Design a protein with these regions (language model features):
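Positively charged n-region of N-terminal signal peptides that target proteins for export
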Residues: 1-5, 21
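Bacterial N-terminal signal peptides
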Residues: 5-17
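Noncatalytic luminal/extracellular "stalk/propeptide" segments of secretory-pathway proteins
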Residues: 22-31, 47, 51-186
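Soluble metallo-hydrolase cores and metallopeptidase-like ectodomains found primarily
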Residues: 26-28, 113, 117-143, 238-322, ...
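N-terminal capping segment at the start of a domain
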Residues: 26-60, 231, 314, 404-408, ...
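Short helix-loop-beta-strand segments that form the rim/entrance of peptidase-like active sites
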Residues: 44, 338-367, 400
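Metal-dependent peptidase/peptidase-like ectodomains
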Residues: 108-110, 123, 146, 150, ...
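Active-site-adjacent substrate-binding region
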Residues: 188-199, 204-207, 211-212, 217, ...
Length: 523
């Protein structure tokens, strides 16, 4: 009984100790709120990132210009150790300077369409008939042999358009947040579905066949988007990566679904359709290397330890990369500025070094952040699989905070299956309940750079954000522009994140970690 009582007292004492060190500092939060909500610069930062230096395709000259601007801005604010860290090789970059597409027969109409990134130039203004290639296997391809040259190839059928009886933008409601909060901790990820490899293999053969037949261009209509919104990403090569200078690539474009459907219906009626198209594009980045932007706010007594915040700086090429991810980049830069102003106002210095990272190559597979983790925290195989940890640095990072889900305000944090941080983050969220930040979920979320850190046994977190019109209108689309950023939401996000980062830097201990099977290796 005495042993049980002593154990209970120990648990209670430990809990009180945890609560004490994680109680939010009201002096810090007051200053953070003032500089984040009342003296915000986030929309001006976003305008520079998007209006002046958008879009920022990895490997493009515009990304290089944006990188120079970001470094200068961070230095002017007073951040330390501002520098670039190389990763790669990535391969060739790309930019386009002119694009047009028209239907010229049976009647004229201008077409809304955009080239896919890494498409080569056409040979001036080219004109030809549209052909629909319908093939389910290699035998079907034989009937198209010798028939694609000088043609525009359609690969998609008609996509039905459903009218927007509900608003394309939305906010999370109480039920949404409750469901997230009640979600169980993630289990083991399912094994890869190897049954799908057959279809994937045929798609590779299909594209290799098309490239060999040398049509004028391949055109699709995307799987979503309407009302002139076109979602566009990168071209495909006959094999391998389009960034490989030796890859064979033909012009490719995505057309608005309304125009694509109209042309398809004309062809169904036996009416030939002729298009004209011109694309002027240039391959760039001859050395093949890319860079992440790194900047720091020095720590004090625990300066050898680090807390990181970051966002990907690169974008796709048809909009200006505003919600993806100029918003996240602007917020993380603004959060860093807020922390600097808070330090000046309060005289309270962070104990750990705060390190900002603006990643590149995220849109091609988290390449910049994975390269950084490889250089600092983990040993990887040639294929990129993490094999062991570089303990000297990996043991000194407390955590990484990421933002990459659009313009929406922060509603909480995805804990990425890490129960140890729940009481800590609950305490840190509490002062921002009035701003709508209330929810913690054990759920994982993917598709962005915190995964690179999580994979290396480092606490890595993405914030829960309001969806707004991210998936329906702006993500990877031609409408991803500054005008779709919500100022009050971005102010709130920068404020909440600045508080989380600074409180992480002030803790006596690093953030709790999940169990990992990864072992220490060579540094």
């Amino acid at each position: 009984m005495k042993k049980l009582s002593l154990l209970l007292l120990l648990v209670i004492a430990t809990s009180f100790s945890l609560l004490a060190q994680d109680a939010p500092n009201p002096t810090l939060n007051t200053a953070i709120r003032k500089h984040g909500m009342e003296k915000s610069q986030v929309m001006d930062i976003a305008s520079w990132v998007c209006d002046v230096y958008g879009p920022r395709l990895t490997g493009s000259p515009m990304l290089d210009k944006a990188t120079d601007w970001a470094q200068k801005t961070l230095k002017d604010w007073g951040m330390s150790n501002v520098h670039l860290e190389a990763w790669g090789p990535f391969g060739r970059g790309w930019e386009f300077s002119h694009f047009e597409m028209h239907a010229t027969a049976p009647s004229y109409f201008p077409i809304i369409a955009y080239p896919k990134a890494w498409s080569p130039s056409t040979k001036g203004l080219v004109s030809g008939e549209v052909i629909y290639l319908q093939a389910d296997d290699e035998a079907d391809l034989e009937k198209y042999k010798g028939k694609l040259k000088g043609k525009f190839v359609f690969l998609d059928t008609i996509r039905t358009i459903n009218e927007w009886f509900d608003a394309p933008a939305k906010r999370l409601v109480a039920e949404d947040l409750l469901n997230m909060a009640n979600a169980p901790a993630p289990g083991r990820r399912p094994d890869r579905d190897f049954n799908r490899l057959g279809g994937f293999s045929f798609n590779q053969k299909l594209f290799k066949f098309i490239v060999a037949e040398d049509p004028l261009a391949v055109i699709d209509r995307g799987f979503k988007g309407d009302l002139g919104t076109v979602f566009v990403s990168g071209a495909r090569a006959d094999e391998g990566r389009v960034q490989d200078p030796k890859a064979k690539v033909i012009p490719q474009a995505t057309m608005s679904v309304e125009h694509y459907n109209r042309i398809f219906r004309l062809m169904q009626k036996g009416i030939p359709v002729t298009l004209s198209m011109e694309l002027k594009a240039t391959y760039t980045n001859p050395d093949g290397m890319e860079h992440n932007i790194i900047a720091e706010i020095p720590g004090s007594d625990l300066k050898d330890e680090v807390v990181m915040l970051g966002a990907h700086f690169d974008s796709w090429h048809t909009g200006t990369g505003a919600t993806d991810n100029g918003a996240g980049s602007a917020v993380m830069m603004e959060a860093s500025r807020i922390i600097l102003e808070t330090i000046k106002e309060t005289g309270i210095k962070p104990r750990r070094t705060i390190r900002l990272a603006l990643w590149t190559g995220e849109e091609q597979g988290l390449l910049g952040s994975r390269g950084y983790v490889k250089d600092h925290y983990a040993n990887t195989s040639p294929e990129g699989t993490i094999q062991s940890l570089k303990e000297a640095e990996q043991s000194k990072i407390s955590g990484y905070f990421n933002l990459d889900n659009g313009t929406g305000k922060v509603r909480g944090v995805y804990l990425q299956g890490n129960p140890g941080v729940m009481p800590i983050f609950r305490a840190w969220l509490d002062p921002f309940k009035d701003l709508g930040a209330t929810t913690l979920t054990m759920q994982n979320t993917g598709g962005t750079d915190h995964q690179s850190f999580d994979a290396a046994g480092i606490p890595g977190f993405q914030f829960i954000q309001e969806p707004v019109a991210y998936s329906t209108r702006t993500h990877h689309s031609n409408m991803d522009n500054w005008d779709h950023l919500v100022a009050d939401d971005l102010k709130q996000a920068a404020t909440v994140i600045a508080s989380f980062v600074l409180h992480t830097a002030m803790r006596d201990e690093k953030l709790p970690r999940k169990a990992t099977e990864l072992k220490a290796g060579s540094n």
